[in-house]
């Protein structure tokens, strides 16, 4: 593995406090209606969007998607773009090309066309949307191609491995974390990172993964979400992934939620 580390995996297993297989079976038994995917994807999309500062309320967006209630386009356009990206992910296997296409979809009303699905070429600092405080400095532009290449090599290897449930959740979270730290796009990185995590879970676990309300859990615990990201350090080349345990625990907590 190049960049996704298994150093914390043993501690993660010991501290999990959850049987992922049993929790997933409970999800399978609970969500049997034909419209379950649209409902839970609507929740995932709007809560992921609100982490990034989108103003539309969660219940309003659910009414928009499930009951076809109309709202002003400036409220619905960007969440709807992200919804289309989730639909695309559901219908396609996780590859770098497919992921870049998903980014093009989710940034249709966020970035100009020539920066959609394209890695940035400029420096990037990551800011917390509510306070405007700088969280950390993302990967320098001259390292982006190398770092994303390393990440996608790891993702591809993991997709071909036979992983336990604990390993699937561990690596999904770690991929999410590394992607956020690299922050490869000019915008849409947070939304894309949470979609990437869910997409990896779906490729490993099947359709039931789309019902895991990880985005909602991160939104409901957004201060902890940012604090756990900040634990690694301020500068990309000095990040300490041994401090990632608190972040890695959030996904299984979402499954138990």
Where is each model-derived feature located?
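FIC/Doc superfamily catalytic core
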Residues: 1-257
């Amino acid at each position: 593995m190049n960049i996704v580390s298994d150093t914390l995996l043993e501690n993660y297993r010991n501290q999990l406090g959850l049987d992922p297989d049993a929790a997933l079976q409970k999800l399978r038994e609970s969500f049997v209606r034909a419209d379950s995917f649209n409902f839970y994807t609507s929740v995932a999309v709007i809560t992921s969007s609100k982490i990034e500062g989108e103003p539309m309320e969660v219940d309003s967006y659910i009414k928009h998607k499930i009951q076809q209630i109309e709202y002003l386009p400036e409220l619905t356009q960007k969440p709807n773009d992200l919804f289309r990206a989730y639909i695309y992910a559901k219908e396609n296997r996780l590859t770098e090309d497919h992921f870049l296409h998903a980014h093009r979809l989710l940034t249709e009303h966020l970035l100009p066309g020539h920066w959609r699905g394209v890695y940035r070429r400029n420096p990037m600092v990551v800011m917390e949307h509510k306070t405007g405080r700088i969280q950390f400095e993302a990967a320098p532009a001259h390292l982006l191609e190398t770092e994303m290449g390393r990440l996608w090599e790891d993702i591809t290897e993991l997709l071909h491995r036979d992983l336990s449930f604990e390993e699937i959740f561990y690596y999904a979270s770690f991929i999410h974390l590394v992607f956020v730290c690299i922050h490869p796009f000019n915008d849409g990185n947070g939304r894309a990172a949470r979609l990437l995590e869910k997409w990896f879970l779906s490729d490993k676990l099947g359709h039931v993964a789309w019902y895991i309300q990880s985005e909602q859990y991160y939104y409901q615990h957004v201060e902890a979400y940012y604090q756990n990201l900040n634990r690694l350090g301020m500068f990309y080349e000095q990040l300490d992934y041994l401090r990632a345990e608190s972040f890695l625990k959030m996904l299984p907590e979402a499954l138990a939620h």
